[in-house]
């Protein structure tokens, strides 16, 4: 029987590594039906749920793994990591102390302790805040459990993010390099191979009834383009809408440059998307803005922006661009960025969306969504 269990674990791990998460979850749960205290199955299922932004569900399995075998360092690390994801910092600190008493310490535990520091506290130690929570694509996958009135994506490239959507979708990219079929379970998906400026100027007037309830903006890595895309999308947004910008959290000064030719080949580049945080806060959106620490370079989330503020941003667009164009990310500006106080754990943010039932209503798709 033990061999059968171990074979089942191996198969589950293989599916997990391939990214077949539903099959892996089912296999782990089958093992736990037979052996509820199986430490590896509990641990791996917990990790899988954490990767799916379900740390609350994963905690009990990670805790069961730790209770089953406290001699495995990774069981301590995984449980503490899940607690930090949920901002349960006091409990996480208690378990770091317990791990030390059990004989575990070293750089991995030091790294977990650093994850509990605020950006300002980290900078006081001479370190950058790094977005090292679960990957942003997993965050998007969690959002796309719901169906939205309309999903817009600017900067689709390979389609890795677009494929996650189950909603009627619009994708815009000047040069698609799709690696898989993006249609999936969507009722439809319109793809426009052009710049976003061209789309909003030439295509949008020919389309009727478009509503943007969820948007992912991952285009030029330059603030003025992202700001213009945001303004254009917000003008056709639903009453409740969420906008996500990729790459707002650089972890070096160099990667925040506007000129990516200054970087080495394959060196990470966020551009100056970070400026949008200040621009939107200055415009009066602090209550709508959050920075999510989804790896590798974060997400800027803007929830339910005020249409009056959007109109002011559009009116003052040239002035705002002139004001911010030559601003660089130096030590003073980095600290001001960290002091905005809008950083939040992505899983905590997801929970806040669930509390207000954002996106929990099925999309009402009209056949007139596209003009004839």
Positions of predicted regions on the chain:
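Alpha-helical segment of the N-proximal tetratricopeptide repeat
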Residues: 3-34
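A short alpha-helical cap/connector motif
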Residues: 15-17, 50, 66-67, 81-85, ...
């Amino acid at each position: 029987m033990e061999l059968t269990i171990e074979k089942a674990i191996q198969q589950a791990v293989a599916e997990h590594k391939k990214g077949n998460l539903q099959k892996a979850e089912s296999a782990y749960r089958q093992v736990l039906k037979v052996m509820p205290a199986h430490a590896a199955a509990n641990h791996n299922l917990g990790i899988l749920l954490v990767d799916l932004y379900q740390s609350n569900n994963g905690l009990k399995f990670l805790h069961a793994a730790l209770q089953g075998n406290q001699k495995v360092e990774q069981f301590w690390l995984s449980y503490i990591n899940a607690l930090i994801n949920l901002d349960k910092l006091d409990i996480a600190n208690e378990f770091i102390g317990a791990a030390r008493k059990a004989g575990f310490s070293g750089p991995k535990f030091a790294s977990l302790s650093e994850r509990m520091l605020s950006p300002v506290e980290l900078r006081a130690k001479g370190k950058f805040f790094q977005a090292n929570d679960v990957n942003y694509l997993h965050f998007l996958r969690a959002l796309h459990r719901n169906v939205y009135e309309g999903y817009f994506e600017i900067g689709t490239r390979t389609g890795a993010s677009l494929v996650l959507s189950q909603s009627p979708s619009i994708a815009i990219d000047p040069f698609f390099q799709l690696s898989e079929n993006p249609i999936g379970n969507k009722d439809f998906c319109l793809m426009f191979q052009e710049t976003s400026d061209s789309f909003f100027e030439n295509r949008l007037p020919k389309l009727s009834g478009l509503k943007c309830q969820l948007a992912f903006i991952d285009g030029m890595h330059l603030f003025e383009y992202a700001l213009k895309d945001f303004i254009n999308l917000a003008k056709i947004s639903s009453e409740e809408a969420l906008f996500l910008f990729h790459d707002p959290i650089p972890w070096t000064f160099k990667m925040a440059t506007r000129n990516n030719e200054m970087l080495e080949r394959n060196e990470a580049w966020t551009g100056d998307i970070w400026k949008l945080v200040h621009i939107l806060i200055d415009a009066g959106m602090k209550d709508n803005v959050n920075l999510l620490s989804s790896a590798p370079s974060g997400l800027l989330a803007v929830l339910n922006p005020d249409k009056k503020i959007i109109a002011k941003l559009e009116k003052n667009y040239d002035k705002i661009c002139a004001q911010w164009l030559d601003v660089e990310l130096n030590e003073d500006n980095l600290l001001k960025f960290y002091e905005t106080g809008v950083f939040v754990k992505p899983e905590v943010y997801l929970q806040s969306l669930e509390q207000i039932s954002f996106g929990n209503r099925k999309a009402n798709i009209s056949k007139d969504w596209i003009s004839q």
